[in-house]
Amino acid sequence: MKKTWIVFWTVFVVVLSGFFYLFWDFWKDTTQSDGERAKAAFTTYTTKWGEQKFSDMYEQLSLHTKKTISKEEFVSRYQNIYGGIEAKAIAVDPMYNGDVMPGEDGQINFHYRLTMETFVEPISFTGKATLVKETQNDLEDWYIHWNPSFILPEMKEGDKVRANTVYPRRGEITDRAGRPLATERVVVDIGINPGEWSQASQTGKMEVSKLLHIPLDDLTSKVQATTSKSTKFIRIATLPQDDARIKQLEKTEGLKLQKKKVRYYPYQDATAHLVGYVGAINQEEYEKRKDQGYKTSDVIGKSGLEQIFEEQLRGSAGGRIVITDADGTEKKTVAERFAKHGQPLALTIDAEVQQTIYQELKNEAGTAAAISPKTGEILALVNSPSFDPNAFVLGMSATEWKQLNENPQKPLLNRFARGFAPGSTFKPITAAIGLASKAITPADSIHVRGLHWQKDASWGGYEVTRVSDYGGPVNLEKALVYSDNIYFAKAALSMGEEQFVKKSELFGFHEALPIPYPLDKSKLYNDGFKNEIQLADSGYGQGEVTMTPLHLALVYSAFANDGNIVNPSLLQEDKKGGYWKTNVMPADVTGTVKQHLIQVMEDPRGTGRGARVPGIRMAGKTGTAELKQKKGEIGLENGWYAVFNVDDPRLLVTMMIEDVRGRGGSHVLDARIKRIFTKVLKE
């Protein structure tokens, strides 16, 4: 009997143990299944979160959450906030630690780390997600209890997110004395409030049309093209703050005025091509620069120094992302970056010299450069005709743009950046290299009768022509004073092509000038000399010879510096001093040519006598370059001057005016050069 009980209890214990083992195993499997299913649900949710599939995310929210926020509100909130802070590269990483089991309340909690890039800086934070087991649409699964802190940390119901961009101040461009060439000013945007405009009187609308020079039909079209009922401001014009029309417009029903700061160019037309202008970034520019932090609403340098030094002038924007309560009171700064203002650009340009020269060129098609012949500092780079760059900043109508773009004098063309045939202003170079190579001497004379000459019959009908026959032999001094083409054609032939090219290239032909502004390279030819006629023509600055006004000025600086060409500088920080080219001609040659250039200005028969300023000793050369495609035709003529003051040289000017035929040739420039030197050196 005792044995029987022992067997009974043994069996009972074994069976009971097996029962508990099976129960535990079942319970454990069920719990692990819940944990794994919760993990799977949350992993899916975080993946959709990173992909910004907000509509799909909403389907995984708990029933309780869905009672507090609609799908439309949920999606809209994420889109608006993430869009406002420019969220991208969103990564949500669940932080799973070992086995997961529901708590006593049946819920499961997961921590996660969210990182994202924003327009301010990257954001990273950890959060906690609570999941509940529910049945929705006949599907039992784990769903997320959502709240606003999922969007940004510490965010609560009713809170808002404010994202502000802090725009940098664009660096000023100033001249050598600190005078602003590009700065900022306050302007006023004139806009239509569609709702109020519809109630405005026809008389009032006509007055707006008249004041702003905008057809009433165009104003009506702008309003009708706006379909959004929430639009309260349609910009129609921008005016300077001191514009007298603003007072009248302020009183007009249906209009709204807003102030803003914009780029401003005080010297307007006078510096337009040098300084350039800024404008709204276009799609092509944006695509190239979007990785550098540019936005579609940014302005960007469009031309000139504004474009060349865009990176330095622009700076970088800052911004703030803050959480506020429903009343707008700030609660928490989520991210902040201070704006980095653009760096200033200080030039060697003298704004007063620039303005003076521009006034002399105004109403002509031409260009000029001015330098300090001893230091190489660039004092002026001038272009005419020009345009007011402020018109591009304020906004230009299609009609205004068409008038500017189709102007036959091409005001948008940057002439000082282009190469032109220098004509007789090239002759001092031929003289210098001829003397240096011993191909000519100061005493050598040519004996040619009449106005025309050719080497021999192999030239066919082609002849070199000079302006006057002075009735006798012509030596170097007379050739420069009288500007004799035949003398310099013969001098070039005497040197020969190899020597002519070798010596001329010492002056910097076919090289980029060492300044941070793109200019054409001056050249002696396009693709070598085709024949000796071209060589002869090149001796007096025709043929295929082209020079920029600045390069011509630098070449002439050699006559003020014993045969050395100064190092040019456009930026104050780049003032190098010294020489760009040394010993381009021997000192004795320099002295000889320089004395002849003085006679060009002082001799009663000198071609530059009309520009001489009493009390200022000047050295220079005039030139007339003829532009024609073939012999026999009458081409356009450009008039040139290259001149500097001799004693304590402070100013060297090169100037070219187009189409001077029938107006006196280079003498069109006489009075202009005289006034420039008088104003700059004597007043």
List PLM regions with ranges:
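Second-shell loop/turn segments in exported
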Residues: 28-33, 43-46, 60-65, 115-119, ...
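Positively charged n-region of N-terminal signal peptides that target proteins for export
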Residues: 1-5
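Short, low-complexity N-terminal intrinsically disordered segments enriched in polar/charged residues
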Residues: 6-47, 51
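Short, gly/Ser/Thr-rich active-site loops of penicillin-recognizing serine hydrolases
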Residues: 670-683
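Extracytoplasmic/periplasmic proteins that interact with beta-lactams or build/remodel peptidoglycan
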Residues: 77-80, 84-367, 387-411, 419
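Short hydrophobic alpha-helical segments used for membrane anchoring or interfacial signaling
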Residues: 368-373
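Beta-lactam-recognizing serine transpeptidase/beta-lactamase-like catalytic domain environment
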Residues: 324-334, 374-424, 429-657, 665
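Short, well-ordered alpha-helical segments enriched in acidic and aromatic residues
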Residues: 51-68
